Amino acid sequence: GAAATIEPLNEHLSHYETRLRNLFGAGVQACYRGPRLYDTEQTRKLVTQWVAFYKQYRQILDSDIIHLRRPDGQDWDGIMHVNPQSKRKAFISVYNPLDIAIEREIEVPLYYTGLTNKAIVKEQDKNGKEYSLARDYSISLKIRIPAKGYNWYIIE
């Protein structure tokens, strides 16, 4: 029924962007069903933006996934792609289901990235900060996620 569709797309841009962001951010190459991918110039630009994002980070997004926190609708959840052979060793996607912006200090397990001593973390691929790995190959990372939103981090 009507509640199960986001057509016309241009009237549901926020929801459509959330779907594109979740799918491409998780490295999902889906077969999209429906009459079209976009219905206006604005929706076409949105699709183009997220396809370009996926293409830019394809190598790491097509890599193995580690679940950081199980989604429960009560707090943040997230996944991390890891690839020790890639320049970008990890790609963290974090989601906030809450109506308020949140900041959390999380433990990020970096064992499967191949990193052993230090990691450089870039929020949305900007302004890298160096972290020393703990003995268990983890770092403590402060994350920020907007209300009902998403954020991502690159680890090199």
Task: Annotate each predicted stretch with a short phrase.
Residues 132-156:
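C-terminal beta-strand-rich structural cap/linker in extracellular carbohydrate-active enzymes
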Residues 1-128, 142-144:
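Active-site-proximal substrate-binding groove within the catalytic cores of carbohydrate-active enzymes
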